[in-house]
């Protein structure tokens, strides 16, 4: 069977499908992920051809042009100081509307509860009432207060998702404030922006996949989810990727 479906409810008994493998010269793309995706999914492939991209097999020469994750699995385990169990990630809720002081209170309580990493919600980016660097400073204080009680240091991934022209400024301000890690929604900003950020920071990057459903939940177009939220995000430089189930 051709694994082109994300949900069991999308199975159709009377539809014949074919698996086709096509080779392209990688010299056509250089290190430009937008051009790669345009070639594989552009024009007829995304409109009338009813074709879904299931996977990409990169040549070693092409893959070497990308840094990929700076930390990788072992690096993230060392960063967390955890090598013998899964790492627990939590996020600040409500999604929006919190001042740094209000968010810090929730951060502190969450840290006491045993979270290893705490991230912003993907909806909480760069509002006027809570700039990323303000959250970093406030949440670091909360993390230190929790450490005094638990002996465990919780890492904070600040959401720097924004317009492309602002992204590096957000990186610098977060770094100067003492951020542990960065979060970026690559589904909204694109793999090439994720790659650019990864090339301009030494901090670990948590890639968020909010919005990728429109890429992979179609049965006759788009790409498979392991490619959309896995291989391409890792190639572009995500150390961690936030992946939901098909049901939320």
Stretches found by the model and what they are:
Residues 86-104, 154-166, 212-225:
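Active-site mouth loops of central-metabolism enzymes
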Residues 135, 139, 143-154, 158, ...:
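N-terminal active-site wall of soluble small-molecule enzyme domains
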Residues 90, 97-124, 130-132, 143, ...:
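Phosphate-binding glycine-rich loops and their immediate beta-loop-alpha structural context
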Residues 86-93, 118-120, 154-160, 182-184, ...:
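Hydrophobic faces of well-ordered beta-strands that scaffold small-molecule active sites
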Residues 69-79, 125-146, 166, 186-202, ...:
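Active-site-adjacent beta->alpha loops and helix N-cap segments on the catalytic face
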Residues 102-113, 135-147, 193-199, 226-235:
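Structured alpha-helical segments in the cores of large, soluble enzyme domains
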Residues 169-171, 177, 181-248:
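Catalytic alpha/beta core domains of metabolic enzymes, predominantly
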Residues 1-111:
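N-terminal capping/small domains of soluble enzymes
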